[in-house]
């Protein structure tokens, strides 16, 4: 994978026209399009408004990718396949139907990922436990099993998330608002076979767990760092509980 970092160069001519060289390009993969919240509709319209890209140097593919089928692992894998086969953008950004974000959130996430060399960088968002907005946890985990196979996930404390505005390394993030580089998706496909070379649901205690966990554990097994951007905080309209804190996988 090429480690060269190229950032947009934005120049304004005497006549006021703006020229962008080396724009950051991204395609948005929208999950659960049949149940999109109004805030997400607004987020997508704003993010794909490329009249703004001359000012911020980010070009978003206005034809976002929609998955097929009801299963998240299949849907996300289908999004990746479509992205690699039919899009020529540099980044795939998963934006779930229950996440509200702004174009500035998207631009900040992509600029940080590209400038700092993150191949996978998630925005920070919280999920309410049992639907109670007063009791939330950030969707990010560290693996406390240093040696041996499997994982023992421990959730980040919210106090650590709000303590800074930079990107920090973690082991597992949610895919609700996450940027993934094209080279890393191509790289993964060399090691994991179809039909699920990227996302899969790990099983523990006869229970299927999130496809985002499976994806991140595969990345970490390949030595790829995963980042959580504490300065990109987006809204998450989730009512179900799916806390993996303490989850042990073998």
Tell me what each language-model feature is.
Residues 61, 90, 119:
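Conserved acidic residues
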Residues 88-100:
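Short beta-strand-to-loop acidic/aromatic patch adjacent to the donor-nucleotide binding site
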Residues 1-67:
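N-proximal low-complexity "stem/linker" segments adjacent to membrane-targeting elements
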Residues 3-12, 19-22, 189-250:
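C-terminal catalytic/acceptor-binding lobe
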Residues 70-75:
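A short, glycine-/small-residue-rich helix N-cap motif at loop->alpha-helix starts
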């Amino acid at each position: 994978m090429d480690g060269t970092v190229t950032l947009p160069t934005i120049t304004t001519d005497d006549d006021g026209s703006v020229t962008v060289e080396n724009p950051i390009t991204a395609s948005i993969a929208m999950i659960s399009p049949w149940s999109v919240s109004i805030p997400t509709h607004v987020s997508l319209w704003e993010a794909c408004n490329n009249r703004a890209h001359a000012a911020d140097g980010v070009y978003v593919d206005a034809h976002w990718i929609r998955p097929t089928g009801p299963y998240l692992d299949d849907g996300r894998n289908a999004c990746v396949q479509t992205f690699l086969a039919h899009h020529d953008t540099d980044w795939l950004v998963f934006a779930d139907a229950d996440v509200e974000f702004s174009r500035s959130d998207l631009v900040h996430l992509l600029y940080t990922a590209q400038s700092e060399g993150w191949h996978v960088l998630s925005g920070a968002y919280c999920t309410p436990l049992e639907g109670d907005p007063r009791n939330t946890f950030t969707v990010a985990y560290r693996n406390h099993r240093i040696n041996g196979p499997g994982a023992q996930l421990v959730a980040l404390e919210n106090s650590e998330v709000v303590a800074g505005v930079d990107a920090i390394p973690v082991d597992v993030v949610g895919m609700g608002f996450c940027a993934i580089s094209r080279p890393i998706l191509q790289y993964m496909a060399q090691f994991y076979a179809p039909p699920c070379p990227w996302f899969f649901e790990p099983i523990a205690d006869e229970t299927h767990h999130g496809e985002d966990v499976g994806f991140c554990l595969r990345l970490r097994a390949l030595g790829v760092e995963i980042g959580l951007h504490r300065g990109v905080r987006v809204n998450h309209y989730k009512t179900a509980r799916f806390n993996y804190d303490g989850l042990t996988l073998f």
